[in-house]
């Protein structure tokens, strides 16, 4: 990263071009202004930060506009769209099974959400971080990889996506969206379902934090680990709680179907499990996921690094 004090030192010496090493790459930043660095405008400052001074002004304008924090709507739309498709598959499998008896087996119904999450992470992970789950947003913020100020917007976008998917399914399939919600098994208890959701979400968020942390970061291929975990957890744990691991995945169909039976299980379990996963990550790796953790949590738009010094 090219720091402004370094730019000032070279600029004050009368030079018009600055070379700096960034991640073993040489970046040339041309100073167009002859006045003090403190007088450069926001766009020029952003260009210096991104090492874009050698590019044409039109290109710089497009890139800095895309990185402008005012463009938060890109992230929010990504969360809305990703959650929509997640709930479309997760709730849709059960609703299809209810409408067309025997058309979808349990294994297919619980594995499909994992595959969809994998696809959505590969598709939109670089835009928003591909949370699609308030428990994930909460965990990233708690660990310091994601700004708390963005959490409410993400949760609202996720909720709207879940409700839209549930409403679409109910209108198209013709059965109540409550058929696609999660409930404790009749042969079990709400407490057992709560404990199952807690443990399953603890594992899920641990996988997410682990694949997004410093030396453990494996980039967008972390989608394979996350999607596989969701599918495997659903295959063996769904008979007790439905293996939701996501408060919004359950709340969307609950709202449309107007049935909130034992919803506390699917709110408290995942959030507590996510918090425990952050504690486990702290024990295993220390505080924060570093630059890689921030990039994974926030996507590649304007990113605020909480711990840029952490490898």
Task: Show the residue positions of the predicted features.
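Membrane-interface helix-loop junctions and terminal tails of multi-pass membrane proteins
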Residues: 34, 39-311
């Amino acid at each position: 990263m090219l720091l402004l004090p370094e730019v000032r030192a070279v600029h004050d010496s009368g030079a018009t071009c600055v070379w700096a090493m960034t991640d073993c790459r040489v970046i040339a930043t041309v100073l167009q202004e002859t006045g003090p660095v403190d007088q450069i405008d926001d766009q020029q400052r952003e260009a210096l930060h991104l090492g874009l001074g050698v590019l044409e002004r039109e290109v710089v304008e497009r890139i800095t506009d895309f990185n402008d924090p005012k463009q938060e709507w890109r992230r929010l739309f990504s969360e809305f769209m990703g959650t929509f498709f997640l709930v479309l598959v997760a709730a849709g499998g059960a609703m299809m099974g209810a409408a067309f008896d025997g058309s979808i087996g349990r294994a297919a119904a619980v594995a499909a959400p994992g595959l969809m999450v994998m696809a959505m992470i590969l598709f939109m992970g670089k835009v928003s971080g591909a949370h699609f789950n308030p428990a994930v947003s909460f965990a990233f913020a708690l660990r310091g990889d994601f700004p708390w100020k963005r959490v409410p917007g993400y949760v609202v976008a996720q909720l709207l996506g879940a409700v839209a998917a549930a409403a679409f399914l109910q209108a198209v399939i013709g059965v109540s969206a409550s058929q696609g919600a999660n409930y404790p098994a009749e042969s079990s208890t709400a407490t057992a379902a709560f404990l199952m959701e807690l443990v399953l979400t603890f594992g899920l968020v641990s996988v997410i934090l682990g694949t997004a942390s410093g030396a453990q970061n494996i980039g967008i291929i972390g989608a394979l680990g996350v999607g596989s975990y969701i599918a495997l957890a659903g295959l063996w744990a769904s008979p007790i709680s439905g293996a939701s691991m996501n408060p919004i995945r359950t709340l969307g169909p609950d709202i449309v179907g107007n049935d909130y039976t034992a919803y506390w299980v699917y709110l408290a379990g995942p959030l507590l499990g996510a918090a425990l996963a952050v504690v486990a990550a702290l024990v295993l790796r220390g505080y924060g996921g570093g630059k890689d953790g921030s990039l994974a949590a926030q996507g590649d738009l304007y990113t605020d690094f909480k711990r840029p010094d952490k490898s």
